[in-house]
Regions:
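NAD(P)+-binding Rossmann beta1-loop-alpha1 motif at the extreme N-terminus of oxidoreductases
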Residues: 2-72, 94, 298
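Rossmann-fold dinucleotide-binding core
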Residues: 101-184
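Hydrophobic beta-strand scaffold residues
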Residues: 37, 57, 121-122, 163, ...
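Helical "substrate-binding/catalytic lid" subdomain
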Residues: 171-294
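Rossmann-fold NAD(P) dinucleotide-binding segment
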Residues: 61-117
Length: 310
């Protein structure tokens, strides 16, 4: 999806921490949208290509300390603490927008620390991956001060199709945890029914074509159909990252006394993948595990299947 020219913003300076698969694609859209953006990544070479879109790639985190809005998109809570600690060592931004998948407790600790420094804080985790971002279909769920959200919203709109404000505090973290628990349960079930259909004699592409045209079809099932049909498991989200999010969900379930038997079973299946050494593949390789458990071998069907993004 092309960037809406009406969304271009230049009123605020933007700092960006993290240029992994997700962070790079998000920062790229901001740069292409005309934002005054400076980017830091632990491995600078991964961020350097952003310069051709107008971003300034910096060597030190401290160079981002006085930006109006500082976005963070890294892997873990420990990473968030480390990079923010260095970024705020010699100054402070007006606002931090934290987009990583972290726990409620970690997010609350960050909020307390930043509020103590007079910095506004938004929890703004996302739904999507790098390909979804490039298609302009990333979505955010956001919690924190409503006034801060209104300031950040134009930048969120540049990166995707929009954002949902769910209230104060860490409510966005709960929403993202619930989202990713559902992601794990749905991909496992999608693999189960796809293998069931195949073992009964149906081509995977035929079954998924029907499913995606039915009321059960969704952006996610359509997006994953090419991988399940043609066994093209380029990495969008690893089993280890999904295990982390399922663990966060199960921890939240214990905290709020909510039984989560499906999430627990799915977590065990993800752990089984990791135990096999399938740690860096895409999480959709659950299909291969399901096929092995069902006594069948899979071959690519080599059928042109659309992913629903274009």
């Amino acid at each position: 999806m092309p960037i809406d020219k009406k969304l271009k913003v230049k009123n605020s300076t933007v700092g960006w921490i993290g240029a992994g698969r997700m962070g790079y694609a998000m920062a790229e859209r901001l740069a292409k949208g005309g934002c005054d953006i400076a980017v830091w990544n632990r491995t600078k070479a991964k961020a350097d290509p952003l310069a051709k879109y107008g971003a300034k790639v910096v060597n030190q985190l401290e160079e981002l300390s006085t930006k109006d809005i500082l976005f963070v998109m890294v892997s873990t809570y420990d990473d968030v603490k480390e990079v923010l600690g260095k970024a705020l060592a010699k100054g402070k931004p007006k606002m931090v927008v934290e987009c990583s998948s972290i726990s409620l407790e970690g997010s609350a600790e960050l909020r307390k620390m930043l509020q103590g420094k007079g910095v506004e804080y938004l929890a703004a985790p996302v739904s999507g991956n790098a390909k979804v971002i490039k298609a302009g279909k990333l979505t955010f769920v956001v919690s924190g001060p409503k006034s801060a959200y209104e300031t950040a919203k134009p930048y969120l709109d540049i990166m995707g199709t929009g954002s949902s404000y769910v209230g104060e505090g860490e409510l966005a973290r709960i929403a993202k945890i619930c989202h990713n628990v559902m992601l794990g349960v749905v991909i496992q079930n999608l693999c189960e029914v796809t293998i069931l259909a195949q073992k009964a004699g149906m081509p995977r592409h035929a079954f998924l074509d029907f499913l995606n045209k039915s009321v059960m079809g969704s952006m996610f099932t359509r997006y994953k159909a090419p991988a399940l049909v043609n066994l093209d498991f380029h990495v969008t989200f690893t089993p280890k990252l999904l295990r982390k999010d399922l663990d966060l969900g199960l921890d939240a379930g214990r905290r709020f006394e909510v039984p989560m038997p499906l999430a627990s079973a799915t977590r065990d299946l993800i752990q089984s993948m990791i135990g096999r050494g399938w740690t860096e593949q895409d999480f959709a390789t659950l299909l291969l595990q399901q096929a092995q458990a069902s006594g069948i071998e899979l071959e690519p069907e080599n059928v042109d299947v659309k992913d629903g993004l274009s």
